[in-house]
From Swiss-Prot:
Changing D205A: Reduces decapping activity. The active site is at H277 (nucleophile). The modification N-acetylalanine is found at A2. This is m7GpppX diphosphatase. One of its GO terms (cellular component) is P-body.
């Protein structure tokens, strides 16, 4: 779901509205699952579909733009984005789909092969629903399918073009500070090293429903403010980075029984928000943004800084941007001049 290019706007993380179901004994012992079945309502009334922004049959996901809170249906409502995603199978519950008398529709039968449409019971048929409301034009553009372009950014490009461009944007990260200050999501923190310089909090990413470990996804957010991205890192930050790598892996082992060699630990460049954070995902999970054009393994980042203190100030970095991103045009024009 993450885009190859960062969103420029307010909070970048998606807000989940989900109906979670009871976890198995093994999951509870591993700390998986913290949802509730209490009734909730969407934060708006009505939904008149305006456009399908994007869909993927492979990923079982669709992005919808709609008008909500309309008084008369004449377009005077507000914009909202709703993302519907089929949740992964939970192995311990799969057998329930085939026991008893499941509702079936035969689609095809030939010799030993047959295909059916199976209609699961309610408790096995949840759809993860992410709501962005009210949605701005930037949100609509973020979720709209667009062409991407690879661009190579030198150290000088970053200092002279990318950084001034970012500083000219309204990049609010107040939601990050709310987490660090325990004003929001405090109950979701899995681990914290409170050191103001070399500490961090570890929290489940909202793209992970915490119902299974196959798509485990956590984020480590550093306490120290002012570190925007990979480009800011120097040997001064090595204690922080080592803490995130080793303490983060240990916390995940203790909480979820997943060893470090089953984890992919990396930073994004460009990041989706400009406060240093590190991604922890299950190795077998093809997480959005884990491709070679965006993900930088934390262990290799540490080694690069140990070998060359100015590695990330000088190195040319490759990343993808949307074809209509103003930053892409600025970088292309500079490189053609």
């Amino acid at each position: 779901m993450a885009d190859a290019a960062p969103q420029l706007g307010k909070r970048k993380r998606e807000l989940d509205v989900e109906e979670a179901h009871a976890a198995s004994t093994e999951e509870k012992e591993a700390g998986v699952g913290n949802g509730t079945c209490a009734p909730v309502r969407l934060p708006f009334s009505g939904f008149r579909l305006q456009k399908v922004l994007r869909e993927s049959a492979r990923d079982k996901i669709i992005f919808l733009h709609g008008k909500v809170n309309e008084a008369s249906g004449d377009g005077d409502g507000e914009d909202a984005v709703v993302i519907l995603e089929k949740t992964p199978f939970q192995v311990e519950q799969v057998a329930q789909l085939l026991t008893g008398s499941p509702e079936l529709q035969l689609q095809f039968s030939n010799d030993i092969y047959s295909t059916y449409h199976l209609f699961p019971p309610r408790q096995l048929n949840d759809v993860k629903t992410t709501v962005v409301y009210p949605a701005t034009e930037k949100h609509l553009q973020k979720y709209l399918r667009q062409d991407l372009r690879l661009i190579r950014e030198t150290g000088d490009d970053y200092r002279n073009i990318t950084l001034p461009h970012l500083e000219s944007q309204s990049l609010s990260i107040q939601w990050v500070y709310n987490i660090l200050d325990k004003k929001a999501e405090a109950d979701r923190i899995v681990f914290e090293n409170p050191d103001p310089s070399d500490g961090f909090v570890l929290i489940p990413d909202l793209k992970w429903n915490q119902q299974q470990l196959d798509d485990l996804y956590l984020i480590a957010i550093c306490h120290r403010r002012g570190i925007r991205s990979l480009r800011d890192l120097t040997p001064e930050h090595l204690p922080l980075l080592r803490n995130i790598l080793h303490q983060g892996q240990e916390a995940i082992l203790q909480r979820y029984r997943m060893k470090g060699d089953h984890l992919r630990v990396y930073l994004h460049y460009l990041p989706s928000y400009y406060h240093l954070h590190v991604h922890f995902t299950a190795l077998g999970f093809e997480a959005p943004g884990s491709g070679v054009e965006r993900a930088h393994l934390l262990a290799e980042v540490i080694e690069n800084l140990e070998c060359d203190p100015r590695h990330y100030q000088q190195r040319t970095l490759t990343f993808a941007l949307r074809a209509d991103d103003p930053l892409l045009k600025l970088l292309q024009e500079a490189q053609q001049s």
